[in-house]
Amino acid sequence: MALTVDVVGPAPWGFRISGGRDFHTPIMVTKVTERGKAEAADLRPGDIIVSINGESAKDMLHAEAQSKIRQSPSPLRLQLDRPQAASPGQANGESSLEVLATRFQSSRRTHTDSQASLSPRPCSPFFTLPPTSPQAPTGEVVTSHSFQSLAYSLEPASADHLYYGGRRGSRQASLSPAGDSAVLVLPPPPSPGARSSSSRLSVVSEGESHLLREDSEVFKMLQENREARMAPRQSSSFRLLQEALEAEERGGTPAYLPSSLSPQSSLPTSRALASPPKLHTCEKCNTSIANQAVRIQEGRYRHPGCYTCADCGLNLKMRGHFWVGDELYCEKHARQRYSAPPTLNSQA
């Protein structure tokens, strides 16, 4: 929509522009100051400036357009091209509620399909058929390598006592076309109420859960094997007490028992007591340095108060020292004792 706006001055006019021939975009109003002159003239962000005071702005550079606007006399006449505003009935480019509802339903279907793609497929090892499915009737034999060890371990007499949640399982067997061994297939699990009322014990074999009666031979055999594999556990304190009692019964020397059975108290005294840290000795006063020490050379240390010039007694901590023979001097007195100053050896 083309319109003309007269902004009453003087400058500043209260708006900003962007674009230009150097940016390959038309000159556009990007910001209008609140309660400013441009806002009073109904200038809005997004308006495209076609001409400035009658001069076409199509081929103007950005800096050129800025200069013409700033130097323009009052009033500033701008010919604008204002884009049409979206109607209130439009939302996200759609003009009706029916189209929006259709898009919402399609998005829900897409979300459902994505969740369904994550569910196990019939060829997946995690796929299980429902109890009422005609593809897996009760008592059907399924050949699986994970059940073969359990199928070989069950004898005909003990397999009759196999229960699943308190219900006797079917004992049908057959061979698959691939030649796998037949295994026992159980009926689907009962309701939670029936499962809680039945007395059973869960036994894990090859990663699959089965239920056996407590008076069956298979349960007793598995229980004996489990108890045989379990190693006896004994606490360290009880073991020490047992060794002490056995040594006393044999008439030997009683074993050493720590008072609080703590590992620290059982250590020898020579190891428990740490040796005191080695202290440096000040070479000037020949006393031990307990706190801070100043290292002059390898194996030579002094107190901070003893680190002074041998002539004037000036502290050399922030100045550094100079060697003259075997004494430390400040720079002033070291130069007085040297005939050749370039041979000074300064150590900070």
From Swiss-Prot:
GO terms of biological process kind: actin cytoskeleton organization; heart development; muscle structure development; protein catabolic process
Cytoplasm in keyword set: yes
Keyword Zinc tagged: yes
Main location: cytoplasm
Key words, A-Z: Cytoplasm, Cytoskeleton, LIM domain, Metal-binding, Phosphoprotein, Zinc
UniProt cross-references to SMART domains, sorted A to Z: LIM, PDZ
Post-translational modification Phosphothreonine, affected residues: T128, T132
Domain LIM zinc-binding: 280-340
UniProt xrefs under Pfam families: DUF4749, LIM, PDZ
Domain PDZ positions: 1-84
Compositionally biased residues, Low complexity: 193-202, 257-270
Subunit and interaction comment: Interacts with alpha-actinins ACTN1 and ACTN4, FLNA and MYH9. Interacts (via LIM zinc-binding domain) with MKRN2.
Task of the protein: Probable adapter protein located at the actin cytoskeleton that promotes cell attachment. Necessary for the migratory capacity of epithelial cells. Overexpression enhances cell adhesion to collagen and fibronectin and suppresses anchorage independent growth. May contribute to tumor cell migratory capacity.
Name of the protein this chain belongs to: PDZ and LIM domain protein 2
Chain's gene name: PDLIM2
